[in-house]
Design a protein with these regions (language model features):
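A short, active-site helix/loop in glycosyltransferases that binds the activated sugar's phosphate group
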Residues: 13-40, 45-49
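Glycosyltransferase donor-sugar binding loop
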Residues: 45, 79, 103-118
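A short helix/loop element that forms part of the nucleotide-sugar donor recognition site in Leloir-type
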Residues: 51-69, 120-121, 218
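A short, well-ordered alpha-helix in the C-terminal region of glycosyltransferases
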Residues: 74, 211, 218-234, 243-246
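A conserved mid-protein helix/loop that constitutes part of the nucleotide-sugar donor-binding site
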Residues: 74-97, 118, 238, 242
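Active-site donor-binding acidic/aromatic loop of nucleotide-activated sugar
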Residues: 113-117, 130-139, 145, 195-196
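Short hydrophobic beta-strand element within catalytic cores of glycosyltransferases
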Residues: 175-178, 188
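Conserved acidic donor-binding segment of nucleotide-sugar-dependent glycosyltransferases
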Residues: 190-191, 195-202, 211-217
Length: 259
């Protein structure tokens, strides 16, 4: 009740900004009378920060050493805060079904409580993934960390309101994988700039990971190039700011006219 009451206050303005169509649908479902007030303005990515040419080799080397990555093995990265709904267990189970060689780094999992980490480690041991999957703390240089990955996974089991990590990966020319729900459905065009797995399906997630790992270099580079252009055109920080300021000006103009 309290959450809905709090959210209802947010609907009292002249306009409502939704950070994704997923959030727009949620607002419409809870407060159908304000549907005409909603404007979708997706969150944006800083294309200077998440630009491969702006990440110096020294930063990449430092992160590679910090993550203790092995040479000549594809890198799978999941970067998220230590919360079970982010899909850590789903990813571990999916990885147990992947036959291709890989190494996976769970960035952020190392910040979790001892109990949280023990649950993940127990599953890693159960599936004999000790040599393939590791838990590390949050990265102080996420750009350099992500650029080391061949695949970036966001396996959230609860739909993300948006999920900017996918766009950050795409801006760096990487291949993101996520379940087909929430904000991920708006930022990944399946097979063109990433892969979408059937919601909550471990088998589907495993298949998408295998598919991404087996891509030929030319196909991988083509997807990466498309991803960078896709983010630049549709999800840049500058675009987000321009759309937001435009809406503010519209609200001010309407207030001056109507009082």
């Amino acid at each position: 009740f309290l959450k809905k009451y709090y959210n209802s206050i947010l609907t009292k303005g002249n306009s409502i900004i939704a950070i994704s169509k997923h959030i727009e649908d949620s607002i419409k479902k809870s407060f159908p009378k304000v549907s005409n007030k909603i404007k979708v303005i997706h969150r944006g990515v800083d294309l200077d920060l998440f630009n491969p040419t702006n990440i110096k080799p020294a930063r990449i080397i430092a992160q590679s050493k910090l993550l203790n990555l092995k040479d000549n093995l594809p890198v799978i990265i999941m970067a998220a805060r230590p919360a079970m709904w982010k899909g850590y267990l789903s990813l571990i189970k999916a990885l147990s079904k992947v036959d291709e060689n890989y190494q996976c780094v769970l960035i952020g999992a190392g910040d979790g409580s001892r109990k949280f980490q023990d649950i993940l480690i127990k599953q890693i041991v159960k599936f004999n993934l000790e040599t393939k999957v590791k838990l590390v703390k949050s990265s102080r240089d996420i750009q350099a960390s992500l650029i080391l990955g061949d695949i970036i996974i966001m396996p959230s089991v609860t739909p993300e309101p948006f999920g900017r990590i996918i766009l950050e990966a795409q801006a760096l020319g990487k291949i993101p994988i996520a379940f087909d729900h929430g904000g991920a459905s708006e930022t990944i065009i399946n097979g063109k700039n990433g892969f979408l797995a059937e919601p909550l399906s471990i088998q589907s997630l495993s298949e998408k990971i295998s598919l991404a790992l087996s891509l030929e270099t030319i196909k991988r580079e083509k997807m990466g190039d498309y991803s960078k252009k896709f983010v630049s055109k549709n999800f840049s920080h500058d675009r987000m700011c321009k759309l937001t300021l435009s809406l503010y000006k519209q609200c001010i103009a309407e207030y001056k006219t109507n009082g």
